[in-house]
């Protein structure tokens, strides 16, 4: 199977740039996997490989595509029928699109990790807790507030990337100094994760009113389970944090939500922990960080699951099997 990549439009150093897909790329003239947003945006890729009998795309942006431009929605929904299989990280969009299009094109997929970047030996936990990401919702503010009295790290691309309500001068003056690392390379981030007991996260997208209206303009939008709580302006999004934390032995402390998408790939209680209310976070961080020996096995279980079930090799094999169906 040939693998064609184009990362135009991606972040500077996302985890998928470290997959090294080309080590698995063998052109048989029959099957091809497209990876990267640029493969959708640049028509030359489809034109050059249209003669292949079996074509797949790995879609990492669902459900974000559904509040973008209609042109991009069409590409992301495979409206031209170019791809035989689309492996997507949004299981709800997969089910919805298959029902709407009356095909079996879309396949729920995990986010893998390149085992060549694994560190087999455990490292000393010198940090209590970490959050990496932006501030786009009061929940993220609460994450930072909850961590600040501990030995914490807050990794961000910078306040310039935060949602508009959190870019006011007053807010930036108060919270930007809490950033401990800005726009760090992936390898450096993984090193920090390995030295950290807890990673707090929410597998949600927080929408603006205009984004909600765009989604509601899509015919049949209400049949997508991902849109079941638009009244709260939230969508489920399976981010890369879970696999990156699991592969680096940091305990996932996940905010419970209406979908709990993390349970598709990891088991609650044995491989990660939930918290229900933001105000519970400080006490949970205190409990786990002070009694790490009672909780370390959870991070270790997640590490075993990630390194056995969610490797890049396994993903490539799943794509090939899917194209053979």
State where each predicted segment sits.
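A charged, aromatic-enriched C-terminal amphipathic alpha-helix characteristic of glycosyltransferases
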Residues: 290-321
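Nucleotide-sugar donor-binding catalytic core of glycosyltransferases
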Residues: 1-29, 34-47, 60-265
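Short, contiguous hydrophobic alpha-helices characteristic of membrane insertion segments
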Residues: 252-253, 270-276, 318-325
């Amino acid at each position: 199977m040939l693998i064609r990549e184009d990362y135009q439009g991606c972040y500077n150093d996302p985890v998928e740039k470290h997959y090294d897909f080309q080590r698995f790329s063998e052109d048989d003239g029959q099957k091809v996997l497209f990876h990267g947003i640029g493969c959708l945006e640049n028509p030359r890729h489809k034109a050059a490989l249209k003669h292949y009998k079996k074509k797949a795309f790995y879609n990492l942006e669902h459900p974000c595509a559904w509040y973008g431009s209609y042109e991009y929605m069409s590409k992301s929904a495979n409206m031209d029928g170019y791809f035989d299989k689309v492996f997507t990280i949004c299981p709800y969009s997969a089910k919805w699109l298959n029902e709407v299009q009356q095909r079996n094109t879309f396949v729920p997929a995990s986010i893998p990790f390149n085992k060549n970047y694994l560190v087999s030996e455990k490292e000393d936990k010198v940090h209590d807790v970490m959050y990496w990401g932006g501030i786009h919702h009061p929940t993220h503010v609460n994450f930072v507030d909850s961590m600040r009295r501990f030995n914490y790290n807050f990794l961000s691309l910078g306040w310039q990337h935060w949602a508009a309500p959190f870019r006011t001068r007053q807010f930036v003056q108060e919270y930007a100094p809490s950033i401990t690392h800005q726009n760090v390379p992936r390898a450096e981030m993984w090193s920090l994760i390995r030295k950290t007991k807890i990673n707090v996260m929410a597998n949600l997208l927080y929408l603006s009113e205009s984004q909600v209206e765009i989604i509601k303009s899509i015919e049949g939008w209400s049949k997508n389970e991902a849109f079941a709580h638009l009244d709260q302006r939230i969508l489920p999004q399976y981010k890369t944090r879970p696999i990156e934390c699991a592969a680096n032995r940091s305990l996932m402390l996940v905010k419970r939500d209406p979908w709990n998408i993390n349970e598709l790939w990891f088991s609650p209680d044995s491989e990660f922990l939930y918290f229900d209310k933001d105000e519970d976070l400080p006490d949970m961080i205190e409990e786990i960080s002070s009694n790490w020996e009672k909780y370390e096995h959870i991070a270790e279980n997640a590490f075993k699951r990630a390194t056995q079930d969610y490797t890049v090799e396994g993903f490539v094999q799943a794509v090939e099997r899917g194209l053979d169906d």
